Amino acid sequence: TVGLYTSPHLKDYRERIKINGNEISEDFVCEFINENKPFFEANELSFFEMTVGLAFDYFAKEKVDIAIIEVGMGGRLDATNIITPLVSVITNIGLDHTQFLGNTLEAIAFEKAGIIKPEIPVVIGEYTSETKAIFLAKAKENNSEIYFSSDLIRESYPSDLIGDYQVHNKKTVLQTIAIINSQKEFKIYESDIKTGLLNVVKNTGLKGRWQKLGEFPKIICDTAHNKNGLEIVLKQIQKEKFDSLHIVLGVVNDKDLDEVLPLFPTKAIYYFCKPNIPRGLDAKILEDNARKFHLLGKTYASVTEAYNESQNIAKE
């Protein structure tokens, strides 16, 4: 059995914790909270720390064979970093959460390198010359074998995740599997790799990764939310054939708008909305800031209203 812990969730909190693709039950979540509430309150644990505790407790009680654990933020001080894994994986480094992790790639790489454990192999997905030096130093300090998947992996397999950026992710996956297979605890066969990569969405439930929601008009949903991610997604959008481009846009209130808004194309119609979460930025504030970068459109009372209106106009 395989446990999967990811964050954040899109619609349902239980998306974060799955075994063999099935979400944790509501009963288990409620029992865990009731049982541990005094401890949580006494120690002032964060929402994320409580959720990590829930995931680990669930995986332990269900006796999963393998657990895939995604770090929440950074790595060195993250609640997930109490484990000793079979292999550590660092996918890429972007300027995100800079108020907590530092405002240079080197500072953020240092935090992410904190998941490198003594004598545990580490796979690096993407790197720059600055971040590579930090990863190499940390691996040497821990006597850990280090693998840069973008330099080592040549073969590829088709996947139901079709964003351009998945090329890098697939290389990282293949390198990680090669290391796990070399440890001889169990074997992941090539047929399993092929099937797995063709069924990522079905097996994980992950949504919003260059996800096609419709064909007439073509509708793409992507949850890219930092400069690196947006640059890649917007570049891929420009490769698409279209007569007109309609962008439904909502952000959270701590987003650096002066950094991300200049990335968006001016030749598009914008539908500004507020995500239905406490951290959502008011749509009017977003529209006012977007106008400074010549991104023009209207504000809508909800994401659903903006989405429906964009479809109606695109069909005309």
Model-found features: residue ranges?
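Short internal beta-strands
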Residues: 5, 121-126, 248-249, 268-276
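ATP-dependent carboxylate-amine ligase catalytic core
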Residues: 3-83, 101, 130
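Conserved catalytic-core segment of NTP-binding enzymes
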Residues: 75-77, 84-143
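Glycine-rich phosphate-binding loop signature in dinucleotide/nucleotide-binding domains
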Residues: 59-65, 237-243, 310-316
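Nucleotide phosphate-binding/pyrophosphate-handling subdomain across enzymes
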Residues: 66-71, 79-89, 93-97, 107, ...
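C-terminal helical cap/extension that packs against the catalytic core
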Residues: 128-147, 218-220, 261-315
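Active-site-proximal loop->helix
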Residues: 8-35, 99-116, 122, 136-137, ...
